[in-house]
Amino acid sequence: MNDNISPIHSPYKAPNTISLVAGKGDTNNPLNAFDMALLDAGICNVNLIKISSIMPPKAEVVPLPDIPMGSLVPTAYGYKTSDIKGETVSAAVSVAIPKDKELCGLIMEYSAIGGKKETEDTVREMAKTGFEMRGWEIDKIISLASECTVENIGCAFAAVALWYK
């Protein structure tokens, strides 16, 4: 560790925006179905870095910004793939935003076999439970979900991308 940098003064700046995105894809293999879902969600051509589920304090919810190709993008995401024709898969994310703006928010992600309504209901309940466990008050919960009814190999994807304003 560099002795000149205190852990309190980390060289890494926390992102100050979050964006919810969701998409679906169906093609001839799981990886391309996932990639197609990223294309549909508008978050392709970047490197998603999977993170645990914390929204930095005071982060602003914004539409997905124009992120340079190849960027490393901190992202909490869920996805579900299937090769069973006619099966519906879904993925959802939610963000619980605290009343106390000095606190962090909670991002939850979930995926399942079934429709997006049930998956979105589940992920919203997960965010609520996370706040209850911490004893925090919720200002609001936002969420987004996708579903894909499989024809070949299908993928449903939902994410919260963290970025900088």
From Swiss-Prot:
- Which gene is transcribed and translated to give this protein? pdaD
Report the GO molecular function annotations: arginine decarboxylase activity
Query: Under which EC number(s) is this enzyme classified?
Result: 4.1.1.19
Q: How many cofactors are bound and how?
A: Binds 1 pyruvoyl group covalently per subunit.
| Protein name stated in the entry | Pyruvoyl-dependent arginine decarboxylase
Catalysed reaction, written as an equation = L-arginine + H(+) = agmatine + CO2
Cofactor(s) annotated in UniProt: pyruvate
Q: Where is this site: Cleavage (non-hydrolytic)?
A: S52, S53
* Family of this protein: Belongs to the PdaD family.
One Pfam short name: PvlArgDC
Q: What class of enzyme is it?
A: lyase
Q: Which HAMAP family does the entry link to? A: PvlArgDC
Which UniProt keyword terms apply here?
Decarboxylase, Lyase, Pyruvate
Note the SS bond partners.
none
Q: Which GO terms describe its biological process?
A: arginine catabolic process
Carrying Pyruvic acid (Ser), the residues are: S53
